[in-house]
Structures are given as C-alpha cells and as structure tokens.
Amino acid sequence: MTLEFSTLGLAPDFVDYMKGWDTQRELHDKVVAAEAPSTVLLLEHAAVYTAGKLTEDHERPFDGTPVVAVDRGGKLTWHGPGQLIAYPILKLKNRSGIRDYVERLEAVMIAVMADYGINAERIKGRAGVWIKADSKGPDRKIAAIGIRVLDGVTMHGIAINCNNDLAPYAQIIACGITDAGVTTMSIEAGRTITPGDIAERVVEEFRKHEEALVSSPEGALL
C-alpha cells in the first residue's frame, strides 16, 4: 500500500493545534521530497478556533477568544474534544483534480455516517457534509472540510463532529454560515459515538479511494 495512517492522539490524549500543524508541515515537506509516503493523520485537538483565508472580522468569536490563523481555505471554525480530525497529507495522482479530491473526502464521511443510520449528504452551495432540514431542525452541518494543496501534496482535511460540545459554536459564525445549524453524530443517532468509535471506519473508507487519489512517485518510501 502507498497510503499510511498515523494516530497522533485521541481522547484523553488531545493534540495541541500548533503541534499538530507543525507535524503536518514537516510531513508535507517529506512527502513532497519523496522522503515519506502519503499519510493520513488522525487525532482529536485540544479546543481551539482556527480561521481560514476567507474569514472576516465579524465572524470571529464574540467574546474575544484567541484564534489561530491558518493557511487552509474556508472560514472560521472550532476544533476540540469529541471531534475526529483527519489530515490527509497526500501526493495527488491528479494535481488538478481538487474538486474530485474534495468530493472523495465527503464520500468518506457520508459512508461512515451511514453505518450509524445517519443520512448525511452534500448540499449544493455549502461546503462539508450536512443533515438536510427535517422535523428536528434546519440544515445542520455535521462535518467540515478545509484543505490546502501545495506542490501537489494536500494539507489540512476533515473534521467530523462525533460527541463534541456545540457550545463553542455559539460564539462564532461557523464557516461563515448564518442560516443553518451545527450537529453531531451522537445527536443525530441518539446515542454516544466517539472519535475512537469511528476512526477505523474512516481508515477503511480512505482505503477505497487510495488508488484513485494517491500518486506513487519513484523513490518514495512505501
């Protein structure tokens, strides 16, 4: 296999955001140089707000909570305990296939959620994975995507709300969205689902897309 997986830390071993970002950048440089294989990093972060390149001032926390500015696309979001993060550091087979890459990330999450009876889907014009409006409420986001591609290798990735507290979202305009809500797998399934519960299924779903996504450059360590 050309794709590897590394668990940096799940509850109670939460990963500081800056430490995780440093790990991403170091691994990215190695993958670009063909000194390491494409790898998906799995983890839970300690609580933090991060702001993508499109974040506007009025979308920042209302209480002045510090925010980490990052080099991914997208806007402001929260990461923390109860949310599974996957950072694919992949050398893309098709360097121009960014839309296909994003759709495959969405497919990974949708398939995992289906295992728990959760009907997650894409909504046109909205990034990430969603539960469409129903008797429980309006459209609500259950997973986020924010990526960067540099020198043909991806960074950042996906965040799946498993059993995280939604209170931090009340302090921000999450992802710049004002007309929809936020939810978790646990809320939608009616039972507790943790990042540790779904991590292996996320790995299995990524494996299904490996051949289509991941380049195997000569000289890479496989």
Swiss-Prot record:
Substrate binds at residues 72-79, 144-146, 157-159. It catalyses: octanoyl-[ACP] + L-lysyl-[protein] = N(6)-octanoyl-L-lysyl-[protein] + holo-[ACP] + H(+). It is found in: Cytoplasm. The active site is at residue 175. Pfam families: LplA-B_cat. Pathway: Protein modification; protein lipoylation via endogenous pathway; protein N(6)-(lipoyl)lysine from octanoyl-[acyl-carrier-protein]: step 1/2. Keywords: Acyltransferase, Cytoplasm, Transferase. The record marks 141 as: Lowers pKa of active site Cys. One of its GO terms (cellular component) is cytoplasm. It is an enzyme of class 2 (transferase). Its EC number is 2.3.1.181. One of its GO terms (biological process) is protein modification process. It comes from the Bacteria. InterPro entries: aa-tRNA-synth_II/BPL/LPL, BPL_LPL_catalytic, Octanoyltransferase, Octanoyltransferase_CS. Residues 34-214 form the BPL/LPL catalytic domain. One of its GO terms (molecular function) is lipoyl(octanoyl) transferase activity. PANTHER family: LIPOYLTRANSFERASE 2, MITOCHONDRIAL-RELATED, OCTANOYLTRANSFERASE. Belongs to the LipB family. In the reaction, the free carboxyl group of octanoic acid is attached via an amide linkage to the epsilon-amino group of a specific lysine residue of lipoyl domains of lipoate-dependent enzymes. Catalyzes the transfer of endogenously produced octanoic acid from octanoyl-acyl-carrier-protein onto the lipoyl domains of lipoate-dependent enzymes. Lipoyl-ACP can also act as a substrate although octanoyl-ACP is likely to be the physiological substrate. HAMAP family: LipB. This is Octanoyltransferase.
